[in-house]
Amino acid sequence: MHLFINMIFLINIVFIISIIFIERRNPQTTWAWILILTFLPILGFIIYILFGQNITREKNFKRKILDDKTKQKYLNSFKSHYKLDNISLKYKDLIMMNFNNDNSTYTQRNDIDLYFDANSLFEEMIDEINKAEKFIHMEFYIFKSDEIGKKILQALTKKAKEGVEVKLLVDSIGNSIHKKDIDKLKAAGGDFKIFFPGFCKYINLRINYRNHRKILIIDSKVAFLGGFNIGDEYLGKDKNIGHWRDTHTKIKGLAINDLEGRFLLDWSYANESDLDIDLKKYFINPHSTDLPKKIIGAQIVSSGPDHTEQQIKNGYFKIINSAKKNLFIQTPYFVPDEPMLEALRLAALSGVDVKIMLPGNPDHKFMGWIANSYFESLLNAGAKIYLYEKGFLHAKTIVADSSICSVGTANMDIRSFSLNFESNIFIYNEAISKSMEEQFFKDLKVCTKVTLESFEKRSIISRIGESITRLVSPLM
C-alpha cells in the first residue's frame, strides 16, 4: 500500500514538472493543477488523466487539424465578398478578425429569426424536417430519447425512409438516445455517429473535450443554431428546474454555408473518412436568385480545442471593447479569465452600461460559487449583475449598442472558450440586436439585482465555497 501511494506521489511530481516545463499552460491553469495534484494526490492523479493532458490533446487533434485545413479548400470555393453596410462597417475590424481566425465568411443575404421558447422552436424544427427533400444534418450535444426527442427521431426516421439523406451527430457524453431508436434510424437509411466515443460513456481519455454544438441544417434552405438541446427539460417539464429560458436562431441565406461546412468537417472527423462532397448539393451559390432579399450581416464563428486561437472568446472580447453605450450579457456559467474580466471592468469604468444576467438557481452549486467570486470586482467597477429567478437561464448571448449581437452555444467561461467545440453566429444588424435587447429587458422583470450591500450579506458557507472554487476555476 505504501509503495502504491509513493508511486502516485512520484507520478504526480512528474505531472507537475510536465505542466510547468513542457506543456507551458497559462499561469492560472498551471497553479490550479499544481494545487489539485499536491493536495489531492490520488484523486488528482485520476482527474489529471481524464481532464488534464495537453499531450494527449495534441495527439487527439493532430489529424483533425490537418483534415480541417485540407477540407477547408472545398469550402473556400464558395466564399463570397460584400461591401459592408453602415452597421457592419462599424465592426470591420471584428469581421476581419473572425475571417483571419476562423475563415468565417461575412455574408449579407440572410434572414434570421430568434426563438426564446422551446415549444415554438421544436415545433418549427419538426416542421422544417418534415419538408426536407435532399438532406438533414443534425449535430447536438444533448439528445434524449424522451417525448420530444422521440418525436424528432421519428421525423428523422420517416424522412430517411423517403430517401432523404439524414446524418445525426451527437456528443458521447451528452447523448442518451436509446439503442433501439438509433437502430430504427439506421434501418431506415439514416446515418448516426458519436463524437469522441470512449471505452464506455464516462471512461474516456477525451472526456474533457466535448462537442457542445447544437446545429440543424435542412437542404441548405434553413438552419438552426443556439443554446437549446433536445430534451423534455427544455420544455419546462423537469419539476426540479421549471421554466427553461434559452435563445436560438433560425437562419436562411448564405450564412448557412459556413455552418454546413462546420458540420461536414465534424462529421468527416467522427466518421474517420475523407470529405467527398458535392458542393452544389450542400452549399448555396452566392449568385442564386432564391436568396433572401434582406440585408442582414452575419458570420458563423466556431472554436474548439483543436485550434490555438480562441475564436469565439476573441469575438466577445472585441464586442466588449467596442461597446460605447451599453453591453448586455446572458450566460448560464460565468467563469471569465483575467483578460475577459478586466475588459468587462474597463467597459463599466468607461461609462458603458454593463449588465450581466446569470441564473439565480444554478444547476451546479459550485458553478454558482465560482460566478459569485467575480461579483465584487465587477460591482465595484460599476457593472450591474442580475440573477434570473423564473426557472433556469441557459441563453448564451451578448448584445452591444443596439447594433451587434452574438447567439450560439458558447458560455462565457473558460471551458467554452478553450475546451469545448462551439459555434456562434455574430449578427451585424440593428433590428435583430434590438429584439435581443427587448428580450433582455423582459427577462429583467423576473430577476433579482445584486448590489454590493446584498452581496456582502451572503453566508459564510458561500464565502468559503467561492474562495475554494475560484482556485480551480481555470479548469472549469
Swiss-Prot record:
E.C. no: 2.7.8.-
Record's subcellular location: Cell membrane
Transmembrane segments: 2-22, 31-51
Membrane topology of this protein: Multi-pass membrane protein
Segment forming the signal sequence: none
Pfam families, alphabetized: PLDc_2, PLDc_N
Reactions performed catalytically: 2 a 1,2-diacyl-sn-glycero-3-phospho-(1'-sn-glycerol) = a cardiolipin + glycerol
CDD domains: PLDc_CLS_1, PLDc_CLS_2
GO biological process terms, semicolon-separated: cardiolipin biosynthetic process
Keywords assigned: Cell membrane, Lipid biosynthesis, Lipid metabolism, Membrane, Phospholipid biosynthesis, Phospholipid metabolism, Repeat, Transferase, Transmembrane, Transmembrane helix
Enzyme class: transferase
A GO CC term attached to the entry: plasma membrane
Domain PLD phosphodiesterase residue range list: 207-234, 389-416
Annotated active site: 212, 214, 219, 394, 396, 401
GO function terms (MF aspect): cardiolipin synthase activity
NCBIfam families the record matches: bac_cardiolipin
Family: Belongs to the phospholipase D family. Cardiolipin synthase subfamily.
Function: Catalyzes the reversible phosphatidyl group transfer from one phosphatidylglycerol molecule to another to form cardiolipin (CL) (diphosphatidylglycerol) and glycerol.
Name under which the protein is recorded: Cardiolipin synthase
